[in-house]
């Protein structure tokens, strides 16, 4: 029985490369000369540090540009509110991994609503779709691409 997995993952190596490139761009930009602005990566959380909240917005644009240049979809970013104090401003940007339960249920409901002859089940942070025909699975992939989800979806482990 053919099957495939629907996942939402970000390559950690590409993420660290994008953050390094963003830090290098900060060093060369005129409006950030002499400031202590930087990006820090810990796991899948990028912390932006800058003297003011206005610069955090500019830094977020730089980060988004670098992520998209490295092939990472920016829909996976979850931006927290900036924290300001006398020493400067900080903002955490979390890179979401996996498909959360409510989103997975929404995807399953969309598949069931299309009345395709496939079975879908939630496996942790993945979604496994299986059906009798490969054509049905390809229809599911086309349907999920049209579905409005604020997460980037990848289709892996296609088995025949």
Swiss-Prot record:
Pfam families: DUF520. Coiled coil: none annotated. Signal peptide: none annotated. GO terms for molecular function: nucleotide binding. It comes from Bordetella petrii (strain ATCC BAA-461 / DSM 12804 / CCUG 43448). Belongs to the YajQ family. PANTHER family: UPF0234 PROTEIN YAJQ (PTHR30476:SF0). InterPro entries: DUF520, UPF0234-like_C, UPF0234_N, YajQ-like_sf. The lineage of its organism: Bacteria, Pseudomonadati, Pseudomonadota, Betaproteobacteria, Burkholderiales. It comes from the Bacteria. Nucleotide-binding protein. This is Nucleotide-binding protein Bpet3698. HAMAP family: YajQ (MF_00632). The keyword Nucleotide-binding applies. GO terms for cellular component: cytosol. The keyword RNA-binding does not apply. Keywords: Nucleotide-binding. NCBIfam families: PRK05412.1.
